[in-house]
Amino acid sequence: SSSAASDVYKRQSEFWGHFEDDCRDSEKSEAEKNPLFYNIFRHTFSNQWDNTWKVNEKEREGYGKKVSFWVHMNNTDDDLFLLERSLGVPLAVNMQGSATENQEAIALNKALPVLVAKGSDDLNVGREASIFECFTQLSSGDFSITDDKGRYYKLDASNMPFAIAENPATNTVSKAGIYWVALDFNAMTYKMREIEKVELWNKPWFGHDVPDTAEMTYQGQGEWSISDYAWVVSHEDGRKDTRYYFICTYVDGFKERWGYYSDDCRGPQNSNPGNYPNFYNIYRFDHSKLEEWDDSWKTLNDSEGVGKKATFHIYMNNTYAADYKHTRSFK
């Protein structure tokens, strides 16, 4: 009867799922995924595992996190029905507002971890897959955090989590200063650590008992420099020696050594730095875990800069290069 047919129609269910029977692109980056990955397709029920989405299990995406889903069954947001989930690590993150440098957008970089042991010639340190960071100056005011998908993030200063905001959201800077800012998209927590100073450390291995430190000047965009510094090269029994690295001191007392990738700047690298692409790279170490001379650079053949003034420039951003770098020159 027409009534029975109507009841069957009312009871009939469908599920809204992935376009493939199995989610084969789940471990690919967002840029590499099939363009239809998040599109919603309407299916009649057959097998409970068919046409399901997966997270990136290889990267433990979303493990220990809470997830939000948005289902867009309209053509307002896209030509096709869409699924949006909040646990994916974004491809790009920016900060912008009245509190940021020149009120311009500040791009956060994939974070470089802070190491707790000295380096080695074969040191291989990659960027954190789910943590974004920047070194920047913030003024008293507001700023927003957005990602490549146009999502806004709201920081909770009480216990340091953050979350996707349902509407455009701003965050407040209570104290102007130079900061290291890091957002962990796996734990959904963040850190803001104020930087007290960045110094050049210069002390040869021998013949110079007292280390020389000189405060560097913040230049903006995560860069520091020092110019016309009287360079120290020791002389003893016909030998010469030079050593340097950089010390970042935070207001809370924690110190990072921004240093060379290996525990010692040995002959081949010291003699031909141009042959080693990571020679001028800056690596981050817990300063308290290292001996005094660990992970220090030397100048060319321990002789460069004798009787000259030195200029150093630090780039703790990915604008100058893909890695954190420094440059040096003598005149």
Language-model features, listed with the residues they occupy:
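Glycine-centered loop/turn motifs
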Residues: G141-D142, D241-R243, G307-A310
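Intrinsically disordered, low-complexity polar regions and short flexible loop motifs
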Residues: F15, F19-L91, C134, K149-K197, ...
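Short, small-residue-biased leader/transition segments that mark boundaries at the very start
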Residues: S2-Q12
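Short low-polarity hydrophobic stretches
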Residues: A176, M216, F246-C248
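Short, aromatic- and glycine-rich surface loops/edge beta-strands on solvent-exposed regions
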Residues: S3, F69-V71, F143-I145, R243-C248
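Hydrophobic residues embedded in beta-strands of well-ordered beta-sheets
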Residues: S1, D78-F81, F132, F143, ...
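Surface-exposed loops/turns
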Residues: S139-S140, K175
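Aromatic- and glycine-rich beta-strand/loop motifs that create alpha-glucan
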Residues: K10-F41, G88-S139, K149-P161, I195-K240, ...
